[in-house]
Regions:
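N- or domain-start disorder-to-order transition segments that initiate the globular core
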Residues: 1-31
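Hydrophobic faces of well-ordered beta-strands that scaffold small-molecule active sites
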Residues: 17-23, 38-42, 77, 102-108, ...
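Active-site-proximal loop/turn and secondary-structure-junction residues that shape catalytic pockets
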Residues: 25, 44-46, 102, 108-112, ...
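Glycine-enriched alpha-helix->loop->beta-strand junction motifs that scaffold or abut catalytic
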Residues: 35-39, 130-131, 146-158, 176, ...
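Catalytic cores of alpha/beta
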Residues: 26-34, 145-146, 168-176
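Catalytic alpha/beta core domains of metabolic enzymes, predominantly
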Residues: 156-251
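Short, surface-exposed connector motifs at secondary-structure boundaries
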Residues: 13, 127-133, 149-158, 235-243
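Active-site beta->alpha loop and helix N-cap motifs at the rims of alpha/beta catalytic domains
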Residues: 37, 46-49, 53-142, 146
């Protein structure tokens, strides 16, 4: 057993944290769940990669897709081909009822990050595929508006493309507003997640440090993402928010 697997097994069994694996590749998911993962994330790029990389396995599901589909309808069919499969695979974990476990993420159109109404309607479609699907949308102004509306509808939602404390704070506030509206309308609130792309922040700062010839040690650079995650966590705790922080993009 390598050190990475030892860490993941310790992390998933000896801490209160949970982890999801960011991939749609079957071999990677099998290894991740064998080492304590309880959920997974996908995006359009990852779905396309796994379909292209394992055509033999997906052939049956792909053959069931009508050949005359175009535009969004074709995209939905391809996404459902993969996320629907994984939603079935993780359903037994989901049905145990442990918060944050047994979910699969499906992402809204990354080319529509400024169109709240489009994302809301797309989220309804993605969420209809299975009760354990979490809809990912960006932490842009439009995305946070859509996030609140989806939370008010009782959908499971995650705000991604988020790198800063203010973004997490805005997501936490939107989650609280949306869930309160759901309760007022007799709707059971879903899971609300605030993704924090720590690794991407580190990547940016690494490039800045190199460009400015600062000579910073790698351990100093990677403290930035950790600091943002800690600060965000404490703020959400002070707000008594039940939104889950998901550090992501880890290297």
């Amino acid at each position: 057993m390598n050190n990475e697997h030892k860490y993941l097994q310790w992390f998933s069994s000896q801490t209160k944290s949970i982890y999801w694996h960011d991939s749609a590749v079957r071999a990677e998911q099998q290894a991740a769940f064998a080492n304590g993962a309880t959920g997974m994330t996908t995006n359009p790029f990852l779905i396309q990669s796994t379909l292209n990389g394992d055509r033999a396995f997906w052939a049956g599901r792909l053959a069931a897709i009508p050949q005359d589909l175009k535009g969004d309808e074709k995209v939905y069919a391809l996404m459902q081909c993969v996320t629907g499969y994984y939603a079935e695979q993780t359903r037994p974990i989901f049905e145990k009822g442990v918060p944050g476990e047994g979910y699969v993420c499906a992402q809204t159109n990354p080319n529509k990050t400024g169109d709240a109404e489009y994302m809301i309607e797309q989220a309804k479609i993605l969420a209809s595929w299975a009760p354990n699907i979490v809809v990912k949308m960006p932490a842009t102004n439009a995305g946070i508006k859509a996030y609140e509306e989806c939370a008010a509808l009782g959908l499971n939602v995650a705000a991604t493309v988020s790198f800063t404390v203010p973004q997490v704070l805005a997501v936490g506030e939107a989650a609280a507003r949306g869930k309160e509206r759901a309760k007022q309308n007799g709707i059971k609130p879903g899971l609300t997640i605030a993704v924090l792309m720590c690794g991407r922040l580190d990547d940016y700062l690494r490039d800045v440090a190199q460009d400015m010839k600062l000579g910073l040690d790698e351990s100093v650079i990677t403290m930035a993402g950790l600091a943002v995650a800690k600060r965000s966590y404490h703020i959400l705790q002070e707000m008594k928010s039940d939104a889950i922080i998901m550090p992501a993009g880890l290297r």
